[in-house]
Amino acid sequence: MKKYKYQLIALFGSALMFTGCGNQNGESSSNSALASNNAEKVYVAPGEQDEFYAFMSGGYSGNLTVYGLPSGRMFKEIPVFSQFATSGYGYSEETKPMLNTSFGFVPWDDSHHPDISQSKGELDGRWIFINGNNTPRIARISLTTFETEEIIEIPNSAGNHSSSFITENTEYVVAGTRFSVPVPQRDMPINEYKANFKGALSFISVDPEHGHMDIKFQLMMPGFNYDLSHPGRDKSHGWFFFTTYNTEEANSLLEVNASQNDKDFIAAVNWKVIEEYVNNGGGELMPANYAHNVYDESTHTATSTMKKEVLTVDPLKVPGAVYFLPTPKSPHGCDVDPTGQYIIGNGKLSADLTVHSFDRMIEAIEGKKFDGEAYGIPILKFEDVLAGTVKSGGLGPLHTEFDGKGNAYTTFFISSEVVKWKLGTWEVIDRKPTFYSVGHLMIPGGNSRKPFGKYVVAMNKITKDRYLPTGPELEHSAQLYDITGDKMELIYDFPTHGEPHYAAGIPAELLAPKSKKIYRLDENKHPYAVTSPDGAKVVREGNEVHIYMSMIRSHFTPDNIEGVKVGDKVYFHITNHEQDFDVPHGFAMIGQNTSELLIMPGQTKSSVWEPKKPGVWPFYCTDFCSALHQEMQGYVRVSPADSNIELSWSLGD
C-alpha cells in the first residue's frame, strides 16, 4: 500500500514538473518567420471556408460542438442531452420528449465520444453518434440538419463510457458500461460486488436507411469496468475490442485497489458469432424499462416510447464469443489501426504502449494458447498475442489515432505530449509538447480505414496561461498540429467549450453540399402547423388555449389576442413562413418559465405559457430578421379567471 502511494506521488510529481516547465519547450523561441508561416496555415480568409469539420463532445455541457479546421472557429453547439435555451431544445413541447428517461425528465448528461457513420470502413457523413455517460444513453444526430434525431436509453448499464463507437458499416453502435452493477438492479451490500455485479456490453443495431436504433442484444460480461472500445476493421471486421480496468472487482478506493494486478484485459468480442446466435433464437429476454425517443423531421415533433424488455446473452453459451487479451494495468484507449491488424492498449500506468496482433490472436485462439480463464472466458497468453512494444519514454498514454501513412500518434497525459511512432517497427519518430496535460486527440478519419492525415488536434485538460484569464473557470485548450511532414508542427491554439473528451473530424466536402437549408412549408406535417396566414386562429379546450400562429418578416399572425384567463395553459404553436436560407425567427413571451423558441424556415414549434395575473402582456421576435425587427411584436390580454371575455384575435385591426 505504502509503496503504491509513493509511486502515485512520483507520477504526479512528474506531471507537475512537465506541466510547470511547458513554456520552456522552445515554443516561445519560434522566430517570426516560422510564426508567420503557421499563421498562413490556419488562416481562412473572409468569405472562404474551412477544409474540415471537427465535432467535439461537450463533456459536462451534455452537447456536441462543431468547429472548423484549420481555423478553430466554433460554428454551432448541437443540443443533445441538455436543455438549450438558445434554440428552445428541451423546452419546446416538440423536443421535451427527447430528454425523457426511465428516471423521468433528465435535462442534462455528460457527453463523451462522438463517432461518425461509416460505409466499408470509410466515413460517409450520414450521422454522428454520441453517448451520455451519466444517465446511459446513445444519441444519433443528423449531419444534414445538425440536429439530434434519436436518443435511446441503455438499461442494465451505468457510466456509459466505452461508447458510442460503430462497426465499419454502421451495423451497430456499442454502449459499454463503465460501472458494473447488479443485474437486475436490487438492494444488496456494496461489499458483495465481486462475482455478483455484471458489465453489460450493448450492441445497438442501426437501420441502414433511416438510422433508427434498437438494442439488438446485451452481452452480460464479468463485473469489471469497461473503459473504451473500438471495432475491428478490414481483416478484423466482425470483432469489437473493449479495454477493462478493475479486474480486481474492487468497490472502494479504486485508485489503489483496482491497480493491484499487473495486467487488466482487452476483451475481444466476436459480435458476428453472437449475431448469428441471436438470429437463430439465442439469448434470453429480460424485463427492462428504458426510453426510446425519436424526432420526426416531417412533423417536427419528438415522441418517447418506454420499452419493457431487452435481449441478453451469456457469453459462455456462445462458443468463441469472447477472449481476454492481457494488457498492462488500467488501459484507457483501445485503438485499432486502419488495416485492422494492430490493437493498441494504452495502459495509463505504463510508459510503454502494448500492441496486440489480430493475426496472432486468431492463431492463439485456434491453437488454444490460453493462460487460464476469468469467469469461464479464456485468457490468451500475453506473449502469443503481442505484436510489439513501443518504448515511448513518455508517461500516461491514453489514446492513439492514425494518419493512414503507417504512423500512429499517442497522447501522454502526465508528460503532456503527443508521440508519433511507426506501425510495425514500433520506433518513436517524433514527439511534441502539449499545453497542458493532453487527454485525447483527433485526426479526421483517424479511427477509420481511410484517415485524412493532415492535422491532429490535441484536447488538453489543463489550460493555465494559454488564453486571457476569465476567472477561476477556463475553457479547455485545444491545439492543432500539422502532420503532413516527417515532424509534427504546432500551428494553432484554440479554446473549446465544455470539456471535450473525444472528437471526430471529416472533410467539409463530404458534408457541406448536403447540409439542409430550409424546411419546405408544403411538407410540414406538424398537427398544429399554419401553412397560410388564413389558418391562424385561437381555440379554447377547457383551460387550454391553443394559438395557431404564423410568423414572417416582420409580423406575427395574429398579433393581438384577447380572452385568455388567469389559470389558463396557453400553447403558442408558431410556424415560420420564411422559405429563404438563414432567416430564422424567435419567439418569447414575458414571464414564461421555459425559454425562447428559435424556429427555422418552414418549421413549427410550440411553447407553453401559464399567465399568473391579469394584464396586457407582450411577446416579440428574439432573432433579428429585418430592418423592422423591433416592430415584430404583439400582445395577449389576460383577464381574471372568472371573467367572460370571449376569445378574439386579429392582425392590423
Region locations from a protein language model:
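Conserved beta-propeller blade signature
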Residues: 53-56, 127-130, 172-174, 239-242, ...
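C-terminal motif of bacterial Sec signal peptides marking the signal peptidase cleavage site
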Residues: 17-20
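Short, conserved, GDST-rich strand-edge loop motifs in beta-rich repeat architectures
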Residues: 40-52, 113-116, 125, 175-197, ...
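Repeated scaffold domains used in trafficking and secretory/extracellular systems
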Residues: 40-43, 85-92, 107-120, 156-166, ...
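Short loop/turn segments immediately following beta-strands, especially the blade-tip
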Residues: 69-74, 143-147, 203-213, 268-293, ...
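N-terminal edge beta-strand
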Residues: 539-569
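Surface loop/turn motifs at the tips and blade-to-blade linkers of beta-strand repeat domains
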Residues: 78-81, 110, 152-156, 216-224, ...
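Extracellular/periplasmic metallocenter environments
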Residues: 600-653
